[in-house]
Amino acid sequence: MGQIVTFFQEVPHIIEEVMNIVLITLSLLAILKGIYNVMTCGLIGLLTFLFLCGKSCSTIYKDNYRLMQLNLDMSGLNATMPLSCSKNNSHHYIQVFNTTGLELTLTNDSLIGHKWCNLSDAHKKDTYDHTLMSIISTFHLSIPNFNHYEAMACDFNGGKISIQYNLSHSSETDAMNHCGTVANGVLEVFRRMTWCTHCDTPLGASIAGFNCVRTSYKYLIIQNTTWEDHCTMSRPSPMGYLSLLSQRAREIYISRRLMGTFTWTLSDSEGNDLPGGYCLQRWMLIEAEMKCFGNTAVAKCNQQHDEEFCDMLRLFDFNKEAIHRLRVEAEKSISLINKAVNSLINDQLIMRNHLRDIMGIPYCNYSRFWYLNDTRSGRTSLPKCWMVSNGSYLNETHFSSDIEQEANNMITEMLRKEYERRQGTTPLGLVDLFVFSTSFYLISVFLHLIKIPTHRHLVGKPCPKPHRLNHMGVCSCGLYKQPGLPTKWKR
């Protein structure tokens, strides 16, 4: 009995302790909620902006996505395809392997005095480099409607290669008069290589589908040369030469069959083949470590071939597979890339960038790419080309809307994958049970609101329970025995 009395004496103290705990808990909740409200009301963001405006730039978009970039080093591709670059605005080069190449010079000084080109005699003597000659043939065959042989002169004595194209388009009138000739075609091909910065189309002049190109140079001279460090103005890239090949529709049927030889191989972080992403190794990048992209990003290249970065991945893959499987020589490698180009790269993308360059719109030079990195999960987007305008890369602010859209796409993709994951891990029976229980609850709420009556009352009389009256107001027990009294339903 004494223990019971003692317990009840301690009850007020226990209640006081409980009240203290409740007050502490409520205080903590109020403080945390207040801090959250202050953080999300925009005050701190406004103060941060006012403090950093004009001083600092952020590379974080949508709070979690960091803007990253990579620069591709395409010098390793010279094992299987020609690379082109520029020393200045007038001297341009095509590299074949590491030992030889071609020099293409826009000049006002003539190198060859005669006006003829005896190709048949050169073929009989067979003294020139066949690899270099195949590149020249590609360049020459890319000239639209070549039928003006007087505009071309050649010299193959002693195994050297010297070809001179005469240009006479220094004025707008000359450009219009010679529109569609071989000289104009040479300039058009040169522009397709994204080289001729001193070539322009006056007032958008065009006749019969040909752009009338104007230049201040009189000659284009092509010569073989030893390979040195010529690329001082631009980095070596295969895209100029491949842009010529992509215009040759007659190669398409041959090239489509070649893709069975090569597979879309993916590599893990150690370089081992693994179908779970693609890693750009150090030799593929400029001043950067290995960069890996997940299956989500790379899979888009297999689904739709409409990104410049996908073209570069295919070129790297082609280069690796050609060296590993075929061990091709120089001349054979040129022939191979000539046939495979339409299966590796999207010629519509190349033409679109070429037209952008002509019209002065920012275009892609296939060298620098940007992508978004999710700081929470480490996932990356598929890199997109960093556009070039007037010889320099655009500032980030010029394509901030594209960055925002890519961040939104990544958020949408994340939500979709999360939904699919949850759908795959949740048993179907459990989902059915949830739907049934929810429906049952809603029906029960409706039934509760309408208050269904349960028994009869005599009008003006108290509740007859436990007696159950029939429609005549009579109960069989005999207590309610007067029939005909008015009744009503009650709950």
UniProtKB/Swiss-Prot annotation:
InterPro entries cross-referenced by the UniProt entry: Arena_glycoprot, Arena_glycoprot_zinc-bd
Marked site positions, Cleavage: 58-59, 259-260
Glycan attachment sites: 78, 88, 98, 108, 118, 166, 224, 365, 373, 390, 395
Site (Important for GP-C-mediated membrane fusion) residue list: 33
Parts of the chain that traverse the membrane: 18-33, 433-453
Keyword field: Disulfide bond, Fusion of virus membrane with host endosomal membrane, Fusion of virus membrane with host membrane, Glycoprotein, Host cell membrane, Host endoplasmic reticulum, Host Golgi apparatus, Host membrane, Host-virus interaction, Lipoprotein, Membrane, Metal-binding, Myristate, Transmembrane, Transmembrane helix, Viral attachment to host cell, Viral envelope protein, Viral penetration into host cytoplasm, Virion, Virus endocytosis by host, Virus entry into host cell, Zinc
N-myristoyl glycine-type lipidated residues: 2
Gene Ontology terms, MF aspect: metal ion binding
GO cellular component terms listed in the entry, alphabetical order: host cell endoplasmic reticulum membrane; host cell Golgi membrane; host cell plasma membrane; membrane; viral envelope; virion membrane
Binding positions for Zn(2+) 1 per the UniProt entry: 57, 467, 475, 477
Ligand binding (Zn(2+) 2): 455, 457, 463
Pfam name, any one: Arena_glycoprot
Residue pairs linked by disulfide bridges in the UniProt entry: 85-231, 117-154, 179-212, 279-292, 301-310, 364-385
Extracellular side, ranges: 2-17, 59-432
Stated family: Belongs to the arenaviridae GPC protein family.
Name assigned to this protein: Pre-glycoprotein polyprotein GP complex
Gene assigned in the entry: GPC
